[in-house]
């Protein structure tokens, strides 16, 4: 089954990237199938190879026939143009309430539209998914409006699955940040059936009579909410939030810092419900049933039913269902006494899931789930069978000399050594205790070795997906997992027992609740302690294609060699170890052009971020985007938007970063950039009183980054480019708070070509710059996102730009860039580029000319 799954997977990849007419695949599959039938009895190996060829062709056919099918009516996207719409819908996925900006709270729900009315026209029957954010105000902390366990109530009434509602909203289509390396948010929503985004005030939502949806899902949703309410009644809020995530799969109450600690320590799989939860649950249930003398078949059936029920309750999605399917197949094949049942279970589960949805092959979740199990089954277990498991079997009847005669010499000698140790300790603790202690010590040592080895192989094998998808080298993952995994194995059954007993009597739940609390606090303490080490925070660029192939090849080599002689197995393990080291500590060559000055305006929405690469390869990042205003944002623009682009470019460290001024849409993402890329210098200009600026400078100093103040008149070289600081004036007093005219304005030149970077400078600064310097530039980074109070005619007359780029957010509430600014730029003869329409824009200045390049066209 494993070979069939691999052939089907390769076929899916071929079908996705090498399109051919469908009849090609059909004819090929039929030809291979008939040839396989002909050779089935004559030449068995050839027949099997032909069967795999047919499976390969069926995989290619399947992914092309399925196409990029959407799960919604695309007509809703035609209505998502800013018009006020009247919408009738029903909730298909509810969520918890969370704090929002300015003292409000929000609940994100997915709704399926029933009828949409626009401009007073008759309602259109539209079936499509919308992610709706509902806002309320002045909330008190509570879990649910009808939760008896939580004190207080939230003014925002939470909406639940199946409720029919009517509301008015302006819809907008989901939009990706159009930078290479960016997360495909639009594709993620489409895969979940979401075609548009919208928001509404709670008081403007009208409840409609009736119910829409599945009664089974309604029951599941109610059970899910009930369990979460019970968790928050049994544990303090901080512990409850972690149990929600670790046991139930509800991550709404986990803050970003906690999430980052688990990621840095390489234990993120502990924080989220994953296949490990299913395996722990299956083991505990099966072991308990067998100890109660339940038969093998009934115990297997009850265990599988328990896993299915758990997957249904958590609603985590594909990872848990994949693990449940693998568990069911593994336990089923175990009943048939099939060898290597784990590999067969893995192949069958993968094949079944890919037949259901072939494109999940390209998701990080699918790949990491199956790579984990494949590493354990193909490398870990075969190695343990000849090491720790080999000796563990020697502990059976270990006092019997006759039993030892049938064992290999080294194992028999191991038994003799244990008996000698027991004999020497007998005088201290007695004969029976000495025998028990020696046997328990041997079992513990062998178990510890197995845990260490599996954890080490797992971390080495996962180095490639961790580097490629998450840009992390998990240097402390081995000790963290060795400490945390056993605690999780204790916490999981204790938490389940606590919740179950909590429905009977809170008094009965106290002891397992205490055990759970101790385990959770030990887990978080370990994670924070190890994740907080500087050694743990190693970020890596996207590996090169050659590095990906080499690391994957090393993993395959280790799997092939694991069942061969010991020297061959060691060679395979060393290859995986070398690949993991290379991924973590050997940076790829950056994707830059030599002997040109590059200026890239990164798409950060309604913010600002510019990457400069000098002719000699030195790098400078000016600003790092951020949210508008002081409100909270679900995005960390530095971590989620700017850093992925820099990693895609192969950049592992920046030479310098600059902040033009202290507004959040320019510096909101800079803290993450400082941590991820450890620049040598941080350039600043005016520093008015600002907690955000003070925190940023303190962060830079704690990281050993030199803070450099720059003023009008400063001029210096950087990697073959010349930089002149045109603003702020050296004698300019800082205001009471950050202002646009605090902006650090830079002119960067290379031979006879130059660029002017304005930040958010406005008329006052522009007039002073024009009068003092009369700057010229081929490229103008338009000030203040194209606002009318910047980009004055006087500046344009002096600069005479051939190109201009505006960093602006799509459908921004400020209606930027202003029409009059675009008209001024057009009259000046500048060709205008905008990040809201073109995405990231790169300009190459070779000293004599400027060449623009759009990321969307690469």
List the model feature ranges, each with a label:
Residues 23-33, 369, 481-486, 544-548:
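Alpha-helical transmembrane segments of polytopic membrane proteins
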Residues 219-231, 242, 250, 258, ...:
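Hydrophobic alpha-helical segments of integral membrane proteins
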Residues 158, 297-301, 342-348, 447-450, ...:
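Alpha-helical transmembrane segments of integral membrane proteins
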Residues 1-4, 215, 247-252, 314-320, ...:
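Hydrophobic alpha-helical transmembrane segments
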Residues 157, 164, 168, 188, ...:
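Non-globular, low-confidence helical/coil segments that flank catalytic cores
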Residues 3, 11, 198, 253-476, ...:
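Hydrophobic alpha-helical transmembrane segments in multi-pass membrane proteins
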Residues 1-87, 134, 138-140, 322, ...:
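N-terminal leader/targeting segments
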Residues 58-269, 629, 637-647, 653, ...:
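Membrane-interface helix/helix-cap signal primarily in integral membrane proteins
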